Structures are given as C-alpha cells and as structure tokens.
C-alpha cells in the first residue's frame, strides 16, 4: 500500500490521470446520492452488515471534524496530520521507526470524515479504496484497548457480529470457501473469528476445526508464488533443455520415437473395443508398453480416494464464473487490446480479476497507450501497481486474522484453559507467519505495519500466558521467617541469603501498601517487617503466597493486571517471636507453611548490657555472618518453647523440640532442599507404552544383553536407546530396557531365551531374533529399531549420524518430488506432498522452515523409508517411521553404504513353542504380511493374464438375441437362450424367493415340467410358488397354531409382499375393516377331546373366559385342559381355566359397532329368539359385510371404545352371508374376591348430587382452596391495570361468590352429555388415511417398556398421584425411587396390566391455580385439573411413550406439532409451510375437552396401538383409555359420557390426533356432498398444523371453496370452532404473513421469522409473583425467590425485545421497577443486549438451562401465562 501511495503522490502524470478519474467518479456519485439515500431506507433490512466500509454509510453519525478538514479541540487539521511522521511512514519505505498510535487515530478520524463527506481535502489526494484500507489497517495495528478511539470501530464490530450470526452455523468448507472469494475485509474478519473460536473449542465442535485453523493460518493467498512462478520456471527449464542443453533439436527426435513407440501404440488403438473388457485390455497393453503397470496399480487407490473431494468442489468453479460476469460494468475503452493484456497480467500476478474500482486505475494508466512503446511503458507501470496490490492483499489478510485473534482474547469468549491454550498456539502460529513476511524483501515497505501487527499478537500471547498461569498449579515456594530483636542484622542476613539462593536480584514486597506493581517475579522475594502493620491481614497473605494455587497480586497499573506471585524462596523478617497468635483461626495454616529462624547477635546483646545508651559498633558484625546465631525451630512451633496443639485447645501443653543451629550457608542449602522435597509429587505410572520394550533376562546376563542391543543399534543404525532398568532416558525413538524378572515395567515384555557373546556373529546374518532368542514379529522389530518420535528437522548435519539411503531421487520437476514422497506418507498425507513440493521449488532458500511447517501437519506411515532428494538448492534427506527426521543441506552430500538393512525376526518364530507366546493379532499380521508379499510379486502378471483372457474371449462364438432383449439383458441369458421381460422377472424373483441359483435353461425346464403336471418335489414346489405369486399382493391371514409347545399366534401370508402404491387407492373410497381380529391376544380356541376346533372364547381376566353355550357344551377343552366352573345365562356363558392368555378384553353392555374383523355392524340390538341349527337361541340380529364360516362362534363384537358387547353365534349361511346372530353380553358373577380396588362401585345405587348422577364414596376429598399467586410489591397500587387476576377463590371471594364445588359441577355437566361425533364409516376411512400418512415417518412395532420403574421415571413427578394416593409423585420418593406406599400401588396395577386387563379409569378433580381474564373471573370460570392415577399413567407411558416420541420427533413433517419449540428455527419451517398454501385458516375451539366424542378418542388410541407392539401392556393401556373416565371429588364419583380429560396420559398427542381426524372427516363429507368421490388420501393433498385444540389449516383452492361447509360439519360433530381472537363471525382465511398459533404470532421481523408472544402475556409477568398459598392475593408474598423471579423477568425482557424498541422500553420500565421493589439482584438488559441474547438462543448459539422445548408449557420460568 505504501508503494501505491508513493507512486500516486510522486508521479505527476499518473497522479493527474488518477485524480481526474476520481473526480469523475465523485461527480457520478453525487448525481446518484439522492436516489441511493431514498433506497437505503427501504432496503435497510437486507443491507450488507459491512455497509460501514462503503462511501455512504447508513450506520455513520455526524462527526466533530468539519467538512473542510480543519482542526477541532482534540483532533488536528488534515494539513497538520499530513505533516506527522506517522503519515510519512505510511507513504514511504522507511522502516526504522514505529507508528505513533495517537497520530494513527487522528489519520483514521480524517479518513472516516473523507469517506462520508466529498468536500474533505483527502478525497483530492487518495481514492476511496485507499482510504478504506488505511482505516481497516489502523484498527488492526492498535492494541485492543485503544481501538475504541478509532472512528467506525463500533460499526465495524457490529458488522462483524452480524456476519457472525449469519455464518456461525455454516460448515467448515463453506467458511473456507468464503474466505477465498470474499472481497469484504469485515466479512473475512468475522469468518476468521468463527473459525478460530470453534478451533479454540474443538472439544465441542470437532478436532478438524483446530487442525484447519492451524493449517490455514500458515497459508497465504499468494497466487504469484504458487502459480505464476512455477509456471514461468517450468517454461524456462523446458526452453533451456530444448536449446542450450540440446543444441541439436533434431537429434532428440529418435529418442522421442523410441520413447513413444508409435507403431505399437497404433496397433493397440486399432484393436481397441468400446466395451468394459476392451478398455481393460487396451489400458493394460499401454501400461505394459511403457512399463508403468506396477506404479499405476499403486496410484489408482489414491486417485479414487481423492475423487469425491474434487466432486464436492465442483460448484465452486460455477460460482466464481458467475460472480466474474455479474460483477462487471460497462467501461469506455479506447484500446481494448492493452486493456485486456493488463487484466490478464493482473490475474497472473494477484490471482484475481481486477474489480470495477481498479479497472478505472488501469484505464487511467492505459489512456495514453496508443503505440507499441507507450503500451510497453504502461504495462511496466501496471506490473509495479499489480505487485503492490498483491502485497496489499497480504497485509489486509494478516490484518483480518490479527483482529480476529485479538477479539477472541476475551474471558467471555475463550473461558476455559483448553481454549486459552489453543488460542495461544494459534497466536504463535500467526506471529511466526507475520515474522516470515517481515524477512521478505518485497514486503520491506510494510514492516511498520507488520511490526504493529506482531505487537498486537505479542499482547495476546502475553495475556494468554497470564491466563494459563492463573489456572495452573504452581510450585510451592519455601518461606523462612527471620525473627529477632531490632538491630541484630536480620535484614542484612536476608539480603546475603538471597544472593546465595539465586544470582538474580531479589524482589521486594512491602505489605504496608495495597498494590504490588514493583514486584519483579524473581526467584527470591524479601518481605521486611511483614507484621509491622496491624491493618494488614498478613497471615492470609502469607498463606496465599505459600500455596500451590496461583496467587494474583493486587496491582494498580493496567499492564500489571493479572500479575502472579512466582518466587521460589520467600525470606521474611519480624521483630516478634510469635508473628501470629496461636489462638488465631489461621494459626495452624500459617505455621504449617513457614519455618522460623530465631536470629540472635550475642555481641550486640552483651554490648547493650555493658554500655546501655551507646550505639553498637561495627565490630559487632562480621562479613561472614559468624556473629549471628541462627536457631531453626521445629515444625509448627509458634514460639521457642511450644508447638501448636493439633486440636486447637491448649497450645502450651506440647513442648517444642530443641532447635537446630545453622550458619548462613547451611541455611541456604536447607532452603533449597526443602523446595525440592516440597514439590515432589507422586504421579501414576502410565499403562503399557508401545514405545518401551523390555528384555527380561537373569542378573548375570544383563551386561551381555546390553552389549547385544548396542551392537544391534550400531549394526542397523537404529534410533532406540538402551537403558538398564525401568528408568528411561531421553530418546528420539523407542527405548530398550534390560530388566530382571523382579523389576516392574510398563511396556512390552520379551523373554531372552539365549544370550552369549558368540551371538554377536549372528548379527552379520541380520537375524536379530536368533541373536537375542526372543519372539518378536518383523513389525515390532522395525518399530523398535527405526521408530521416530515426532518430527525433527536437523539444520546441522554430521555424516556419521546420517542413515543409509534406500532411495536417491534427483528432483527435476515437482512430480519427481511428489512421487518419491508417497513412499513416506499415509494415504491422507500423500495429498499434502504436492503442496510441499511447490514450496521447495519456488523458494529453495527457505527449505527447512517450509518442510518444518509441512511435517507438523503430515502423517507418516509406519514403514521405515529413507530417501535422499537432490534438489537445485541442495540435498534433503528424509527418514520416516511413524515420525520423521529430515536433514536439509545447502550442498550435495551423498551418503555411502548402500541400502539400509531391514531387521528380520528369523524363520523359526512360528515353529515349535514360539507361536504359543504370540497373540492372535501378531499371527494374523504375519499371515497378511506374507499374503501381501505374494500379491506384490504376482500382481502385474495377474493383471496381464486377466487382460489376456479377456482379449482371447473376443473370438468366442456368441449367440444373438432378437427383439427387445437384444443388447438389453444379454448378460443374464443363457447360451443361445433369450428371455422376455416377464420371463426375466420371473427367473430373478424365483431365485431370490427360494434362495436358489438356477440357470436360465434350468428355470425354463423346471417351469415346463411344472406346467405339464410333473409330480416331482421341484415341480410341486414351483407350482406352489407360482400360485402364491399370482395371488393379491395384500393377502395374509392370522392363525392360531396349537401344538406340543403350546399356543402360537402366527401371520400366514397368502401372497408375496409388494410395495404400496401411493397413487389411486380404492381402499380409501369406502369403509373396510383392518382384516384382523380385535383383541386377538385375548382370543383362544375351544376344542373337543380329540383336539378338533369347536369355536372361540374371549379372556375376561384372571382365568375367566366368555363364550357361547353351544360351543362349550359337552367335553370342551381349552389349550389341552378341560374347562371348569361353567356358568350360563341364556346362550352367553363363562368358564374358568388354569391356562391364562397374555391379554384380556373389556366387556360392556351396549350396542356393537364393529364385527370381529373390523367391519361396521348394522343392528337394532333388540334380543329375541331365533331358530338355528343348534336350537332356539336368544340373540340380536345384525348385518355385516364379512363372510363367516362354521367355527367362528364366540368371536367378539365391539363398540367404539373397543369393549366387547356381544359374541358371534351364527350366520345366514351361503344364501344370506351378511346376516349374523349375536349374543349380547350379560353379567355373570365369576369373582371369588375383589380383583382390584376402585372408587366407582357399579353395585352401589345412583344418587343425584347438584344435578349430577353419581355414586357416593366412603371417603371425602375436598377441593384445594386458596392461591399461590400474589400481587408484586411493585404493583400494589396499580394491579387493577392488568387484564388478568388470579382465578375465583370460591364463595368468600367478593369478585364472584360462586363456590368451588359449584364451579366444578358446572364444568362437569358438559362431560355428561353424549357427543356422537362423525359418522362411523367416515371416521374409520379417515383413520386409515391418517395411519397411512403417519406411516411415512413413524416406524412400526415400536417396543413397549418392560420395566415398571423405567416407565415410572418417564412421568412428570411434579403432578398428582391420582385418587388412590394423596400428594404429588415426588412427595412419595426417597433418593429418587418410589417409597413403599407408592411402590405397592404401582406393583398392583402393573401386575394387572401385564395380564392385559384394563385398569379402573378414575381421576381426582381439582381447579387450576392460574391467572384468568377479569371477565372470566367475574363469571366464576376456572379450568379443571384431572389428576390421573399414577398406576394408569405408568402403564400408558410403558405402552405408548415410544410411539408418542416418534410422532413428536417428526413434527416438522407431519400435522402434529407436539414437541415443537417456538423459540427455535422450527418456527421458520412453520412459516414456509404456511406461505406455500393457497388459503390459510387459523382456528380455535371453545370447550374442546368436553366436546370430544369417545369414538374419535378411541380411534386415536387405536392409531397409537397400530404403531406399537402387540404386548399385554399395550392391550391394557388401550382398553383403559377407551373406557369412560370417572371424576372423583367431594366424596362422589361421576362417570362421564363424553370428553377427553385434560390429565389423561398422552393427552396432547391424542388431542392432536383427534383434531386431525375431525378435520379430515369434515373435508371428506363436504367433498362427497358435492358429488366428488374421495378415493385418495386427504392428508396428502392439504397441510395442517395442530397442537390440541389449536389449529392452522393450509387448504388448496378446492378445499377452501367449501370451507363454510367444512366448519359447519365440525359444528355438527359437537365441536365449537371459533376465530383465534374469539371474535364473533364466520371463520375466514387470514393473511399468511401473520398467523397466530400456540398464542404466538408467526411473522417476519427484522431479525427473521419469529413467533411473537402475546404482549399482554409478557406484561402480566411483572404484576404477579408466586409465593405461599393464601386467600389474600392482593398482599405481596412474604418471601420471594430471587433466582427464579429474576430468571422469569429476564426471559420476559428477551421475549419483549422481539416486539420492537418502543414496546421494549415500556417493559424495561416495569422490569426496573420490579427489581427495585422486589429486591432482586438483576440488571435488566438493554434492548440491543436482549435482542442479541434472544437471537443467540433462537439460533442455538447460546444455550440456556431453562429452555422448554415444548409448547404445551410456556418457555418462561413461571407458569403465569394463559396457555
């Protein structure tokens, strides 16, 4: 950049053209200014976040600098700024001085003004791009704490934050691609910050982020070095080879012909065939011709693995070409040739097509290029300009990375130690990269900028080191206190002692001051008179110093913040014998950490006694400190006589040991020893290390084994180190330990079986195993001898240390280097070899640094390979085995000695007993190694022979097929046999079904024999297969098989299973049953004594079975056992059996609606006598569409709730197959004792209670009174302004005198009215459609839970236990498990459920404590709470929780939205679904729960049962939920006739399924009323979203045209559809841009698609608060939980931020008032902060613990909202 500015300012002609171009551009901008400002207001929502970097910035505000650039009170004028040294350094190449930060800020301020005001004088000297670049670099070069003074800094930060929100969730490949193509420096900075942030937290995001960050920080987009220079270099080398090295080009022609072999090549091409075998033959011949067969086979694997990586980048080329052509604008070009030449030159140098702004510069330089000479001169000027642009792009890239790293150096961003360590490593990498650029001669003019960037990174590195030190355990210092009378020489002795402990000057701390900026951190610290001040808590200060935990010193200066105490030795002095009193609570901790030295000076004491009042002479002090008496006290001696009492009671009871007298030298030595002992730590030894090898021998053989290992190391030039004993020394490779059998060792052990001096001769034969007598594989031996730990680069070379070469490669081109490196690398590492080869060839003088960077990120293979590369810059020797060592020399050195010897283990390792000690992995490894060697020797010949066989097969006679089989399925036909398409399908299907491999001829022959009626086994099986293949695709039959093993229920398929046709399906056109028997797990076969089937029976539970009399008369058996205790009532009978079926069916006296196979039943259900073949039978006449047969008697007929109401007992025969005779269910008492306790007793008489027909109970459970909702202290006077109040409290409430009992009775009365719902046939057709629709994403046969406790733990433990047990579930839990009372209740219900018996369906009734609208409070309306029995809830959770979870997990794809989080991107999916509809209807329903038809609820439960397994638990749960609910309150039990209790298990899912079927039935009836037959699945032709009673219907035009009739049908079903806002009027389509669903308004906001919570719901959060239960709700609660209340108000602020700043300011005042009056420790967030937090939580960037991912409860902390 500095070269560009110098070029512009110093070259008059160029400057004149340049300024003219700028003026023209500015004039055009002024003409378009008005239009731009007008459009900016309307397009602000979609504006680029980096708009602050352009000419007219919408984010900019007015500046204090005048338009003419004159001075202000704090900023000098533009004329004065241009005279500063900083400005001169920016425009010159002087690199001796640093840039002044203050002057840099002033320059940036004027540049900002120049960007916003065209009148500023800077616009006449520099263009917009230069001004913007200077401003960006000014921000990067300043330290982070000084950037706030730069203009536009906050706008830049805001822009980067917006980019961060847009790109944070993008994958790594997308971000890296954006860095490569983006021209926006703010966007690039934000992307770098995202990459580096995720790299710091790679534990959460993946290790690939950290690896990619390290790699990309070392890379720079230098197109000139990467592409242009190698291209030019290759051209020069080729030209030199053709001219200088080969002066006679024609002499090269014979060599070229001999190399190409054109005649052989032509013959191969002539014989080529365009078939698979032809290509194999041709390619193999070409590989043989040029002798590249082996290397081609080795390379194919690498090419295939990299193929998919290239495909993934195919779209990048298209996007770049598109951006190139769409970014151009028209230019008036006088000479297009030179114009395009300049553009091509710019691309070759910078790697980028020049943008529109730089095209104007090119045009200005080429305006006078009208001749050849002037064109060449202009091109030279442009080349210099392009080189400067290339350097500028590097500086801008480095600036962006520096800003990103410096902004991550924040405790709120990088919070843990791991992230700080990774940030430190990344900062060091970038620092090293910038340092490399400072050494580049081309970048010398940018050294001031680069040095400032390095200074910024130095600050980051220092800060990270401080943060790491704070969190790291430190060495515990040694603290000695010199006590004694004043004047004895303690301070002087402390100084002398410090010099003996360390060569550094001691640090000095004064505890009388409260900050310690003067502390230097040296090894010794002296604190003189540490206890002189009573105001200082010196005891705790000393305890903090002598500690392993880091101690942060209190410092006043900003740069010293975070300074740690790091001294190793602490010397303190004191005049007190007891610095800390023993009675102090910190005395024990203090004296445990310090050692006290009692210092006395006998000469001084005698002088003071002899001559009191005279000064002490110097003769009393000696230089060697022999005048001092140093007495070291014992541990924890608080004075000379006593030791601290461990119990802290009597401190004068334990005598101190005698002191130890020392001199100054021995004291220093003692302190050093104490420091070493104090910091010794016991560390757990690692497990078996794979790099440690132990050779176990006898003690007498240790020296011999050591000599053998050293001989092996010298013979093989190995890298391991020989150690005697388990202790290891430093080694670059493995360590070989010579051990005795008794020594412990964590490594791999090998037993030495032979060991003598004569074995040294065996090494010449290279048989290491025979020499040592150990059993080792070749791989282990190679690993021992040649493994290299890490990557090592040796810049200095000793010839005796170089390994012997295995390969010598002369590098003439980049391909030579890459091809040789492949031997050293794994498959992943081979792709990085090409990059390294480019670096080596382009910059040969930087070979060690580049190879070091490359080696750090490269994975080397485990094979030992040594290669010597002879390059133009010198010789490089690379040795690899796990790791790598590299020697880079500037001259040619060839190591003599041939090929390195490969260690082998000998041929006897698997013979005899040696194999017994090898693990199987080693044996198989040897086998695979042997197979690999065999393959390597035959792979070429195998390929050649295969190709030769294919070539020979060309001349084999072939049969031709005719017709459509020709060239179609020829490979599948036999010799001379052609199949039609149908025959081909038959052949394939027959082989697949019968698991055969018949040829075509055998299949045709078998089919022919079967058609002729052959009776052999194969022909009979074929005819059976053919008949089953021709049957319908959906035929199957359920059968009961009775055998020796018992009774089995199996499904026998009568046809092959075929795919479902999703098109026209006639099964939806009319009602039909499912084809399977209801309650099949409860149905058994009744047989006679011979086992012949007579009829069926149905299990009622506990071994009681129901059947018909003519089936069980005589000797009847069930499951091979005679039945007993037979009781009859007419034709209906019951009996007992000890054989119990796995499930039971519920019975009920009522009218059936379904026959045993699910078909509808038409009957008047009036019993009368009918004449049958078995005599007169009293039964009911019915008609169905199912044909029955003899033996079907006893099968159940059911009602809408799945209860058995009658048994099949006869039919009309072949003449009238639809006529059926059904025996009604009659109660027969078969109970020996009560089966299960229940509240509702059928035997008790009915009573009337306040208009309800009910049963009286023995106990009375009253309805809870009072409320926990109170007025907030902040709104005692104005709570009436709120639209909601706590619900009515009963008869004593002045707002509504209605009693709680009356409220419950009024709420229950609608449940007692019968609601019919949709017609039977319509309902079951829609049920089939919904099942078919859900089958697309809900799996079948979801297993039920088999563990009772596991099912119980799936429940919400904050809810009621139901009518049989008082309190909530968590009240009956101990240590997370149920107590005995709850466990007994669960066990009794679970036992019945495992037998398939339905449980009592009873609920306890309460009233919900909540806020209600004031008008509803005055009317006395409260919502009921149905408390379900905990046993029923557990059984239902076990049966259907898996199905429910499968449905809710796919809410994005289906109509049911249970489980959706309206504060997440899921709301965007809802918005897209709504927008795609032709018409949208939002519907709510009044009194939804009480208007539900039992038949619809039973159909929904059957849907859940359809997707679950067929276990008894599922039968029990389904039968229980289908039975009528019973409400229990105030000592009465009411059996309701309709409705769906709100506390029913899985109520949200069942309600949603009901909703879907209601809407489907209404649509079906509306269409068929218009003579439109519905033969398709309705749910595939429209979309809907439902959550209980909330619904949004997205109708196509056809459905919308009959919407009035649809809603009319819903009303006819008993429902009460209303508008969402409860207003009166017909339901009409709404605007899809603002749809209300789940009390949320789904709309587009400036932040994206959001679900806005109702404003009144947010505001009433601040008026009421939860507290103790009371009737006085107008009085604030006595205690307030500040945590939950603070979280509630915080979330309310976040929700309010989505409604805009005006509404948020209103909420903010309420929040501040609540904080003040309620005493909360909460600071309400500002609008921008609340908006940022909500958006972060919405996008998943910032998680919160109170997030509720379900919309049936509010996402705020408190449940005050009306749901």
Swiss-Prot record:
Q: Where is the SF3 helicase domain?
A: 458-614
Q: Which keywords does the record carry?
A: ATP-binding, Covalent protein-RNA linkage, Eukaryotic host gene expression shutoff by virus, Eukaryotic host translation shutoff by virus, Host endoplasmic reticulum, Host gene expression shutoff by virus, Host membrane, Host-virus interaction, Hydrolase, Membrane, Nucleotide-binding, Nucleotidyltransferase, Phosphoprotein, Protease, RNA-directed RNA polymerase, Thiol protease, Transferase, Viral RNA replication
One matching Pfam family is Peptidase_C24
Impact reported for residue 1079 to A: No effect on protease activity in vitro
Modified-residue entries (Phosphoserine), positions: 1067
What InterPro entries does the record point to?
AAA+_ATPase, DNA/RNA_pol_sf, Helic/Pol/Pept_Calicivir-typ, Helicase_SF3_ssDNA/RNA_vir, Helicase_SF3_ssRNA_vir, P-loop_NTPase, Peptidase_C24, Peptidase_S1_PA
The protein's organism comes out as Feline calicivirus (strain Japanese F4) (FCV)
Swapping residue 1093 to A leads to an effect described as: No effect on protease activity in vitro
Reading the lineage from the top rank, the first entry is: Viruses
Q: Name the PROSITE patterns on file.
A: CV_3CL_PRO, RDRP_SSRNA_POS, SF3_HELICASE_2
What does altering residue 1193 to A do?
A: Complete loss of protease activity in vitro
Where do the catalytic residues lie? Answer: 1110 (for 3clpro activity), 1131 (for 3clpro activity), 1193 (for 3clpro activity)
**MF terms in GO:** ATP binding; ATP hydrolysis activity; cysteine-type endopeptidase activity; RNA binding; RNA helicase activity; RNA-directed RNA polymerase activity
In this chain the RdRp catalytic domain maps to 1478-1603
Q: What is its EC number?
A: 3.6.1.15, 2.7.7.48, 3.4.22.66
Which Gene Ontology CC terms are recorded? host cell endoplasmic reticulum membrane; membrane
Binding positions (ATP): 484-491
The protein's name? Genome polyprotein
Can you give the residue ranges of the Peptidase C24 domain?
1073-1229
Q: What is the effect of changing residue 1110 to A?
A: Complete loss of protease activity in vitro
Q: Which residues carry this modification: O-(5'-phospho-RNA)-tyrosine?
A: 984
């Amino acid at each position: 950049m500095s070269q560009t500015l110098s070029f512009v300012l110093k070259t008059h002609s160029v400057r004149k053209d340049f300024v003219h171009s700028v003026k023209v551009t500015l004039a055009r901008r002024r003409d378009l200014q008005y239009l731009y400002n007008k459009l900016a207001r309307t397009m602000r929502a979609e504006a680029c976040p980096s708009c602050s970097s352009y000419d007219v910035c919408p984010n900019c505000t007015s500046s204090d600098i005048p338009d003419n650039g004159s001075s202000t009170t704090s900023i000098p004028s533009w004329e004065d700024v241009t005279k500063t040294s900083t400005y001169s350094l920016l425009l010159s190449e002087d690199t001796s001085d640093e840039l002044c930060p203050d002057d840099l800020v002033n320059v940036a301020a004027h540049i900002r003004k120049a960007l916003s005001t065209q009148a500023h004088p800077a616009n006449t000297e520099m263009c917009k791009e230069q001004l913007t670049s200077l401003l960006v670099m000014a921000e990067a070069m300043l330290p982070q704490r000084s950037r706030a003074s730069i203009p536009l800094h906050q706008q830049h930060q805001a822009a980067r934050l917006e980019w961060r929100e847009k790109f944070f969730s993008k994958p790594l490949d997308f971000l890296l691609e954006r860095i490569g193509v983006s021209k926006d420096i703010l966007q690039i900075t934000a992307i770098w910050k995202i990459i580096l942030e995720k790299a710091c937290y790679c534990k959460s995001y993946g290790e690939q982020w950290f690896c990619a960050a390290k790699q990309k920080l070392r890379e720079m987009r230098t197109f000139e070095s990467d592409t242009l220079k190698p291209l030019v270099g290759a051209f020069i080398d080729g030209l030199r080879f053709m001219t200088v090295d080969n002066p006679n080009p024609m002499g090269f022609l014979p060599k070229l012909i001999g190399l190409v072999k054109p005649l052989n090549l032509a013959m191969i091409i002539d014989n080529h065939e365009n078939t698979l075998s032809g290509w194999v033959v041709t390619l193999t011949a070409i590989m043989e011709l040029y002798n590249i067969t082996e290397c081609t086979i080795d390379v194919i694997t690498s090419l295939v693995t990299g193929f998919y990586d290239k495909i993934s980048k195919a779209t990048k080329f298209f996007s770049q070409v598109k951006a190139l052509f769409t970014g151009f604008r028209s230019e008036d070009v006088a000479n297009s040739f030179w114009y395009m030449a300049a553009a091509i030159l710019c691309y070759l140098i910078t790697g980028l097509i020049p943008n529109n702004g730089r095209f104007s510069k090119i045009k200005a330089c080429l305006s006078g290029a009208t001749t050849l000479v002037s064109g060449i001169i202009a091109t030279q000027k442009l080349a210099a300009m392009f080189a400067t642009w290339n350097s500028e792009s590097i500086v801008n890239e480095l600036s962006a990375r520096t800003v990103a790293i410096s902004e991550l150096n924040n405790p709120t961003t990088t919070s843990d130690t791991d992230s700080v360590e990774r940030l430190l490593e990344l900062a060091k990498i970038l620092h090293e990269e910038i340092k490399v650029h400072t050494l580049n001669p081309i970048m010398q003019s940018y050294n001031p900028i680069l040095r400032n960037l390095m200074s910024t990174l130095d600050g980051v590195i220092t800060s990270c080191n401080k943060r790491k030190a704070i969190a790291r355990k430190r060495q515990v210092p040694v603290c000695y206190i010199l006590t004694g009378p004043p004047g004895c020489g303690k301070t002087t002795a402390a100084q002398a002692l410090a010099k003996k402990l360390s060569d550094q000057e001691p640090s000095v701390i004064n505890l009388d001051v409260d900050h310690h900026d003067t502390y230097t951190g040296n090894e010794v610290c002296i604190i003189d008179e540490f206890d002189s001040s009573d105001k200082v808590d010196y005891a705790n200060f000393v305890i903090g110093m002598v500690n392993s935990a880091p101690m942060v010193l209190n410092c006043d200066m900003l740069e010293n913040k975070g300074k740690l105490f790091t001294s190793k030795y602490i010397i303190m002095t004191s005049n007190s014998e007891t610095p800390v009193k023993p009675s102090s609570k910190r005395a024990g901790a203090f004296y445990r950490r310090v050692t006290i030295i009692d210092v006395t000076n006998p000469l001084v004491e005698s002088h003071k006694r002899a001559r009191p009042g005279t000064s002490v002479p110097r003769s009393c002090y000696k230089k060697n400190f022999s005048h001092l008496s140093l007495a070291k006290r014992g541990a924890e001696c608080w004075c000379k006589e006593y030791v601290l009492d461990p119990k802290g009671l009597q401190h004068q009871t334990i005598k101190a040991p005698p002191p130890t007298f020392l001199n100054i030298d021995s004291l220093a030595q003692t302190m050093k020893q104490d420091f070493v002992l104090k910091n010794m730590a016991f560390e757990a030894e690692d497990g078996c290390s794979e790099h440690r090898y132990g050779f176990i021998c006898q003690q007498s053989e240790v020296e011999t084994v050591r000599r053998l290992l050293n001989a092996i190391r010298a013979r093989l030039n190995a890298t391991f180190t020989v150690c005697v004993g388990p202790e290891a020394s430093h080694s670059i490779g493995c360590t070989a330990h010579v051990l005795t059998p008794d020594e412990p060792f964590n490594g791999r052990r090998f037993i030495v079986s032979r060991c003598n001096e004569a074995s040294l001769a065996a090494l010449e034969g290279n048989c290491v195993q025979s020499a040592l007598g150990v059993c080792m594989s070749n791989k282990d031996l190679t690993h021992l001898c040649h493994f290299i730990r890490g990557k090592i680069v040796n810049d200095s070379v000793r010839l005796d240390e170089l390994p012997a070469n295995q390969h010598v490669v002369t590098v003439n081109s980049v391909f030579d280097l890459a091809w040789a490196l492949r031997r050293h690398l794994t498959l992943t590492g081979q792709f990085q070899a090409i990059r390294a080869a480019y670096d080596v060839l382009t910059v040969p003088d930087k070979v060690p640094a580049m190879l070091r960077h490359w080696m750090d990120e490269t994975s080397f293979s485990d094979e030992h390979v040594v290669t010597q590369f002879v390059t133009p810059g010198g010789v490089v020797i690379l040795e690899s085995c796990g790791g790598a060592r590299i020697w880079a020399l500037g001259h040619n050195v060839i190591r003599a000695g041939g090929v390195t010897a490969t260690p082998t283990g000998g041929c006897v390792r698997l013979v005899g007993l040696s194999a017994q000690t090898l693990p199987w992995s080693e044996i198989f490894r040897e086998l695979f190694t042997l197979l690999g060697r065999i393959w390597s020797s035959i792979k070429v010949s195998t390929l050649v022979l295969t190709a030769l066989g294919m070539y020979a097969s060309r001349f084999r006679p072939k049969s031709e097929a005719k017709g459509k089989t020709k060239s179609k399925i020829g490979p599948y036909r036999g010799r001379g046999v052609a199949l039609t398409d149908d025959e081909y399908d038959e052949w394939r299907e027959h082989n697949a079904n019968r698991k055969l491999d018949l040829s075509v001829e055998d299949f045709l022959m078998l089919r022919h024999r079967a058609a002729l009626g052959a009776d052999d086994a194969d022909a009979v099986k074929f005819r059976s297969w053919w008949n089953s293949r021709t049957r319908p695709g959906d035929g199957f039959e359920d059968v009961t098989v009775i055998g020796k093993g018992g009774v089995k229920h199996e499904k026998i398929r009568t046809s092959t299973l075929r795919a479902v046709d999703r098109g026209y399906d006639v099964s939806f056109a009319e009602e039909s049953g499912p084809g399977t028997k209801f309650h099949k797990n409860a149905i058994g076969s009744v047989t006679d004594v011979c086992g012949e089937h007579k009829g069926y029976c149905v299990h009622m539970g506990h071994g009681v079975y129901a059947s018909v009399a003519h089936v069980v008369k005589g000797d009847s058996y069930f499951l091979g056992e005679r039945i007993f205790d037979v009781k009859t009532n007419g034709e209906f009978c019951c009996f007992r059996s000890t054989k119990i079926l796995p499930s039971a069916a519920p019975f009920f006296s009522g009218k059936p609606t379904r026959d045993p196979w699910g078909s509808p039943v038409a009957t008047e259900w009036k019993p009368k006598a009918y004449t049958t073949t078995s005599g007169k039978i009293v039964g009911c006449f019915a008609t169905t569409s199912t044909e029955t047969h003899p033996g079907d008697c006893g099968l159940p007929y059911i009602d809408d709730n799945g209860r058995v109401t009658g048994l099949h007992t006869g039919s009309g025969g072949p003449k009238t197959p639809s006529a059926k005779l059904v025996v009604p269910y009659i109660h027969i008492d078969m109970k020996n004792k009560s089966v299960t306790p229940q509240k509702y007793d059928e035997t008790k008489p009915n009573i009337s209670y306040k208009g309800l027909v009910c049963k009286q109970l023995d106990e009375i459970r009253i309805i809870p009174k009072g409320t926990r909702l109170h007025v907030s202290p902040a709104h005692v006077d104005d709570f009436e302004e709120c639209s909601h109040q706590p619900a009515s409290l009963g008869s004593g409430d002045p707002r509504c005198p209605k009693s709680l009992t009356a409220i419950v009775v009024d709420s229950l009365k609608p449940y007692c009215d019968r609601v019919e719902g949709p017609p039977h046939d319509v309902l079951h057709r829609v049920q089939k459609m919904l099942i078919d629709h859900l089958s697309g994403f809900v799996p079948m046969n979801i297993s039920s839970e088999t563990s009772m406790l596991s099912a119980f733990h799936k429940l919400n433990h904050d809810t009621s236990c139901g009518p049989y047990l008082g309190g909530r579930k968590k009240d009956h839990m101990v240590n997370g498990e149920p107590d005995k009372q709850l466990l007994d209740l669960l066990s009794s219900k679970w036992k019945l459920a495992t037998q398939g018996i339905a449980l009592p369906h009873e609920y306890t009734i309460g009233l919900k404590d909540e806020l209600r609208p004031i008008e509803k409070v005055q009317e006395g309306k409260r919502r009921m709470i149905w408390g379900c029995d905990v046993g029923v809830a557990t059984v239902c959770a076990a049966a259907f929780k898996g199905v429910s979870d499968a449905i809710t997990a796919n809410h994005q794809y289906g109509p049911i939205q249970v489980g959706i989080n309206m504060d997440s991107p899921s709301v965007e999916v809802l918005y897209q679904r709504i927008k795609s509809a032709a018409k949208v209807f939002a519907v709510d329903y009044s009194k939804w729960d009480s208007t539900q038809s039992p038949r619809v609820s039973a159909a929904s439960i059957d849907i859940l049962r359809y997707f679950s397994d067929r276990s008894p638990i599922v039968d029990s749960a389904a039968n229980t939920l289908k039975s009528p609910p019973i409400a229990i309150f105030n000592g009465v039990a009411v059996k309701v006739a309709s409705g769906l209790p709100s506390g029913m298990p899985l109520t949200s899912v069942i309600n949603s399924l009901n909703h879907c079927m209601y809407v489907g039935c209404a649509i079906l009836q509306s269409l068929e009323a218009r003579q439109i037959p519905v033969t398709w699945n309705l749910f595939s032709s429209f979309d809907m979203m439902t959550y209980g009673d909330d619904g949004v219907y997205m109708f196509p035009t056809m459905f919308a045209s009959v919407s009035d009739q649809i809603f009319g049908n819903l009303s006819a079903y008993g429902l009460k559809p209303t508008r969402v806002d409860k207003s009166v009027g017909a339901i009409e389509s709404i605007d899809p841009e603002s749809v209300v669903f789940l009390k949320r308004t789904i709309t587009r906001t400036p932040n994206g698609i959001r679900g806005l919570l109702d404003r009144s719901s947010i505001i009433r959060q601040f008026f009421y608060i939860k507290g103790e239960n009371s009737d006085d709700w107008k009085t604030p609660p006595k205690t307030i939980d500040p945590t939950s209340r603070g979280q509630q108000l915080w979330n309310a602020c976040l929700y309010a931020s989505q409604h805009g700043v005006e509404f948020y300011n209103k909420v903010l005042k309420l929040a501040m008032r609540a904080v003040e009056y309620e005493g909360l420790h909460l600071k309400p967030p500002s609008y921008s902060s609340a908006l940022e937090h909500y958006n972060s939580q919405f996008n998943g960037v910032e998680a919160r613990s109170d997030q509720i991912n379900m919309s049936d409860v509010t996402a705020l902390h408190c449940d005050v909202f009306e749901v």
